[in-house]
Regions:
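Ferredoxin-type iron-sulfur electron-transfer modules in oxidoreductases and energy-metabolism complexes
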Residues: 34-46, 90-91, 95-242
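Iron-sulfur-associated redox domains of electron-transfer enzymes in respiratory
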Residues: 2-103, 143, 147, 152-155, ...
């Protein structure tokens, strides 16, 4: 017999202190399979009226609703809620309040490297790899397990400086710009130097054991990290990992 409720835990972070509440989600009907976002919206409406979290499109297009569910990043709008789930903010970014994390220290890494000097030409067509990378929704799930991002130790939400070390997201942005047919050849060297300055070498040393996962299924290892490494260090990455 199907239950009319789900029992979950929601972690709250306020004034540098963490707490946990038990929340009983009331299904609209016994067959309902709610998303985690549905749980948060109901909890805010009925129990914790100042519960803080982000969401936008509700259709897996924007990535801003990403939270940790049982310790792993998931899109709240597309993750089915289950009994005993634990909902918490992304562990890889500093918490502002409750489930809201500070995201802009990553985007600051790309200042000066997200503009194309050439005028748009609709007759210039990018290849399939470029279009694959445009599927990124900036959910930052790829930060989980990244050995390079761990070096940033992102704990202070009041720090507005760009993180010194890169991550799969920032390298995806650089790789997409690198293979963009509108990017002039003379700018590509600067893109590779930027990747090196963000610590690309760390991936090179342990490429074989690198485990990074994209929230929407982009093959970050093969489509982002490997081509950047090859552009930066020639075929050395191929020889090193055979």
């Amino acid at each position: 017999m199907q239950s009319n409720t789900l029992s979950l835990k929601i972690k709250l972070f306020r004034d540098k202190k963490s707490s946990e509440i038990n929340y009983l989600y009331k299904k609209k009907d016994p067959s309902e399979r709610p998303m985690v976002l549905d749980v948060l919206l109901q909890a805010q409406e009925e129990s914790v009226d100042d519960l803080s979290f982000r969401y936008g499109c509700r259709a897996r297009n924007c990535g801003v609703c990403t939270v940790d569910i049982n310790g792993k990043p998931r899109l709240a709008c597309r993750a089915r809620a289950k009994d005993n789930d634990v909902i918490s903010p992304l562990a890889t970014l500093p918490v502002v309040k409750d489930l809201i994390v500070k995201r802009d220290n990553i985007s600051r890494q790309l200042i000066g490297f997200n503009n194309i000097a050439s005028k748009n030409n609709l007759n210039v067509e990018a290849d399939k790899t470029y279009h694959n990378l445009t599927a990124c929704i900036e959910c930052y799930a790829c930060l989980d397990g990244c050995p390079l991002h761990k070096k940033n130790k992102p704990v202070e939400k009041d720090n507005n400086n760009a993180y010194p070390f890169g991550n799969p997201f920032s390298f995806l942005k650089l790789q997409r710009l690198y293979i963009d047919p509108l990017t002039p050849e003379e700018e590509k060297l600067g893109i590779i130097e930027k990747a090196k300055s963000l610590g690309l070498e760390t991936y090179r040393r342990d490429y074989k054991n690198l485990k990074i996962k994209c929230g929407v299924g982009i093959n970050l290892k093969e489509e982002v990290i490997k081509p950047l490494l090859n552009a930066a260090y020639g075929d050395q990455i191929e020889k090193k990992n055979k």
